[in-house]
Amino acid sequence: MEWVWALVLLAALGGGSAERDCRVSSFRVKENFDKARFSGLWYAIAKKDPEGLFLQDNIIAEFSVDEKGHMSATAKGRVRLLSNWEVCADMVGTFTDTEDPAKFKMKYWGVASFLQRGNDDHWIIDTDYDTFALQYSCRLQNLDGTCADSYSFVFSRDPNGLSPETRRLVRQRQEELCLERQYRWIEHNGYCQSRPSRNSL
């Protein structure tokens, strides 16, 4: 009987040592990230929100790379202002390379002056370029190196979403970011494609 308790104790010790490392510096990103393959149209199908005003749904982003290899992006999505005023907002972003090809500094701003602007880390956690991408940004770190204010997008080339197999892979990577069950699905109903110009910013 003693050996049974010994096995239980070993299992408990093993489980404790296998705890996730939620420090931002420990997060894996896409190896050998290729900006050119990543360029093009992406539909945001799920997101983890940061603090503050943020695009809510119908979010479409288009990434491009110029002849000098610099990446930029434009995005459009629905945002709610003053509780009941819904508009389609345009955002612009430029990216500065770092030593890691999957980690960028992203300077972004809204075409309308009251929309958010900033200069955030922008990491590509994973992508296969053809179907899905998982992006992550940490705006503020705690003293222990974990993230105090983050946001993350799940992108798809198809507005209808991802296959079950790809969703399982994305969920695994979300867990590695310590963000499981913190995402919400994003609706795509053509809202920003059907709005008159007076409802756009």
Swiss-Prot record:
**What are the GO cellular component annotations?**
extracellular region; extracellular space
Q: What is the lineage of its organism?
A: Eukaryota, Metazoa, Chordata, Craniata, Vertebrata
Q: Which family does it belong to?
A: Belongs to the calycin superfamily. Lipocalin family.
Q: Mind listing the UniProt keywords for this protein, alphabetically?
A: Disulfide bond, Methylation, Retinol-binding, Secreted, Signal, Transport, Vitamin A
GO biological process entries? cardiac muscle tissue development; detection of light stimulus involved in visual perception; embryonic organ morphogenesis; embryonic retina morphogenesis in camera-type eye; embryonic skeletal system development; eye development; female genitalia morphogenesis; gluconeogenesis
Residues where Omega-N-methylarginine occurs?
139
Q: By what name is this protein known?
A: Retinol-binding protein 4
Q: Which Pfam families match?
A: Lipocalin
